[in-house]
């Protein structure tokens, strides 16, 4: 919005041209989302407490989690508001990629909101029925996937980028839609599974978003894209603004979500953030890079799949409890130790992922 306004004002005063600089807008996008999140935090927490919208804790979970009962949840609303407002202010709104991410963010946020509402307000422990949750996730993902395919059909925007191989970039055709669907829905649910400890999901989300901000900048720059042997995608650079907004909103939320948490993001936050990261990865043609940088989310998801599969096939569990962060809790690790070690692993994976861009 401000980009459009600055274009007109620059005719009167050239100083307004600063709003056209991507680096400037990326920084202020981060700061705007951070300030909004920090400002909303105390008000959101107080409002949720008045409405008695508190976290539901399973009886079969770790005993250390029983003290979390009643902690305000659905705090992901403030993350989404901060991101959306910041992006609307600082991004070029004529860019279709920006709207694709915002659609997933808002749509998955709505699905998560209904799920949280049923759990904590209507006291329905199951929340939104799984098949309906999956149905709406699928509808949103397919709408966005077909939109993205129609925009970039038969261009580098629909090629498959394989790490370590600079000349392997096949055109996917309609397989692009299937891959996009799988990545968006899968990442959404992976982040949701990871969100089980104070600050555990939000910091890896921040790290991955920061990594994708750098990738988006390179992908949208013809010279750097050529240097790194990745596809040059014309609309990609504006995703930098989306990524930095996620970073700012995430850091602001962490202020209140760090151990011991004053508020949880709930499904409204985790489903939306995961869906947004998946969408960004697809738009940048970096699905494999997401697997590396988002390795914490991948491992958390695999631990659940392996646990369920092992129990059904052999009647035995592999882990003491899944997702795997609970396994380490039950082994006696204090919660802060689990959280910080997962953060360290996440940061390492993001750096490794970025390094693979040059190893081709």
Swiss-Prot record:
Pathway: Cell wall biogenesis; peptidoglycan biosynthesis
Transmembrane segments: 27-47, 73-93, 94-114, 132-152, 168-188, 199-219, 236-256, 263-283, 288-308, 338-358
Classification via Pfam families: Glycos_transf_4, MraY_sig1
Uppermost EC category: transferase
PANTHER family listed in its UniProt record: PHOSPHO-N-ACETYLMURAMOYL-PENTAPEPTIDE-TRANSFERASE, PHOSPHO-N-ACETYLMURAMOYL-PENTAPEPTIDE-TRANSFERASE HOMOLOG
Family the entry assigns: Belongs to the glycosyltransferase 4 family. MraY subfamily.
HAMAP family: MraY
Protein known as: Phospho-N-acetylmuramoyl-pentapeptide-transferase
């Amino acid at each position: 919005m401000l980009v459009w306004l600055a274009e007109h004002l620059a005719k009167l005063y050239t100083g307004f041209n600063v709003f056209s600089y991507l680096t400037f807008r990326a920084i202020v996008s981060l700061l705007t989302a951070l300030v909004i999140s920090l400002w909303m935090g105390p008000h959101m927490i107080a409002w949720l407490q008045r409405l008695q919208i508190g976290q539901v804790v399973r009886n079969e979970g770790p005993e250390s989690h029983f003290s979390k009962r009643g902690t305000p949840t659905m705090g992901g609303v403030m993350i989404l508001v901060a991101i959306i407002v910041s992006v609307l202010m600082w991004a070029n709104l004529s860019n279709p990629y920006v709207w694709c991410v915002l659609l997933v963010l808002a749509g998955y946020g709505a699905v998560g909101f209904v799920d949280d509402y049923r759990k904590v307000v209507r006291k329905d422990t199951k929340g939104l029925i799984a098949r309906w949750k999956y149905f709406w996730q699928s509808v949103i993902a397919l709408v966005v996937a077909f939109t993205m395919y129609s925009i970039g059909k038969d261009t580098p925007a629909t090629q498959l980028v394989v790490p370590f191989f600079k000349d392997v970039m096949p055109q996917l055709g309609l397989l692009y839609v299937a891959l996009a669907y799988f990545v968006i829905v899968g990442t959404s649910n992976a982040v949701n599974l990871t969100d089980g400890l104070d600050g555990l999901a939000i910091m890896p989300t921040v790290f991955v978003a920061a990594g994708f901000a750098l990738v988006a900048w390179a992908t949208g720059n013809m010279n750097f894209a050529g240097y790194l042997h990745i596809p040059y995608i014309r609309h990609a650079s504006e995703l930098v603004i989306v990524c930095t907004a996620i970073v700012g909103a995430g850091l602001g939320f962490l202020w209140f979500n760090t151990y011991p948490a004053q508020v949880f993001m709930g499904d409204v936050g985790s489903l939306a953030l995961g869906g947004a990261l998946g969408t960004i990865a697809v738009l940048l043609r970096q699905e494999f890079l997401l697997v590396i940088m988002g390795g914490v989310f991948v491992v958390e998801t695999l631990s659940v799949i392996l646990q369920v599969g092992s129990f059904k096939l052999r009647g035995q569990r592999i882990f003491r409890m899944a997702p795997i962060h609970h396994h380490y809790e039950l082994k006696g690790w204090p919660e802060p130790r689990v959280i910080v070690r997962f953060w360290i692993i996440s940061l390492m994976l993001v750096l490794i992922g970025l390094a693979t861009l040059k190893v081709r």
